[in-house]
Amino acid sequence: MSRCPDLCRRDNPSHSHHTTTMTTVAPTQTIPVKVLKKSSRPKDNWYYWEDVAHDLDGISLPKSVKDEILACSLEYTRTVIPHWTNRARYVAFMRIIIMGIIAEFKGDLLDVTKGDNVLNYSLDGVLSDLFTGTPDPAGMAREYKTFLLCSGDKSSGRRSGEFFRRYVNNLAHSPRRYFRMRDSDALCRFTIAVALACGDHDDVWFTNEQFDFLAELGDTMYDAVSFFKHRSEGETNSTFAYAPSDLRVAAFKQCREVLWALNAAWNDRPEMACVTSFLRYFGGPLHMMMRRYRYVEEDMTMGREEDSEIVDQTRNNYKLWNRIDASKQRDQDADSVEKKRYENIVAHGDSLLFPGLARWLEDEGEGHCDTCLYCPSYGAETTHCFGGVELCESCRPQWRDHVLSFRERAAKVFPELRPVYKRAAEDIIAPASKRTCVEATKAATENAPASPDSGVCV
């Protein structure tokens, strides 16, 4: 990921001056892009439950787009939570996903800071339908409102505001902080809680540390598969925009193996099946089954590099994707309004933000490093790059170390993994050196080129 120096600057706590208006010419395209002939979209038949068929009546979107949103909500719900016993909660989750889809590509249609009415829903009412009687309904409500707030700002004119700038600056603080924020952005712990609720497992819960680990596992796998999708979107919240992209394949392999180890460890706990099922589908098969992804359009492949046609389609919300282009101008008049909005969000952080986020935004919203590259407004400047903070050379190693330590960290959070690790059947085709996954990954990647689309097989 590279930055245009005319568009970004190092905004750090040590700088007392802040640019409020900035105009530049469009950056020069330096990477050759293969332009493909525009292809027509194949015909789709959309299916969704009657329960939600009229949920978007009166919303300012074309009927064809509404149909696609409703179908997408069904496909996601049925894929990541294939089994349910509580139908009312299941329908409530479909409505959660409908709101979430719109937040991700048409954020101007909603703003959670303006009250309980979101689209045609009572947000608190839907959340109550989903989590009443579960261990932490208030915590899950905060989790989802954080998602709506950040996703809605990212895909709207509010993206250049004070809140989103401070939010993205914090993503680059550390791997641990990033994964907690990515957890909310991907609704990972939230959907694990939903899976338990929809199966009526109201007495099953995880510690915060366990939720952190499960979310990191799911998000790492999802982001590894979605690498090129996220680049085509100019995404700010993508794991391998910060962690070394040359570890993408090895990280997926490592997480997949730990997920299967969890399946073995929980063999006598049927209530955990919905948790591992979510992580398994979220981490890969989702991209094959949902029409929101390009598996069919790309000849039944995953991991194909984006081109200018895909970026243009993303900019036009094809498949409900959203392109985050770098802003060429920051509106000085809007700055004071956005500053007040940010202050209001922080003041109501105990209901709008997950615990700890308001403090992070206040304490380190200007960034934590004097040499990482921060921006007054975030987005991708050209094709083949992400839209967030660019890490400096001294900050990069901690991300590599964090990724490579995943297997050991997993066993500390879930000690039941240790005996599973010990009794694992060794692949007889594996190298005779019998290196651990981490050792093999380190050996394979120590001198690997840091190209944005390279991968390491171990």
Per-segment meaning from a language model:
Residues 1-458:
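Alpha-helical, largely C-terminal catalytic domains
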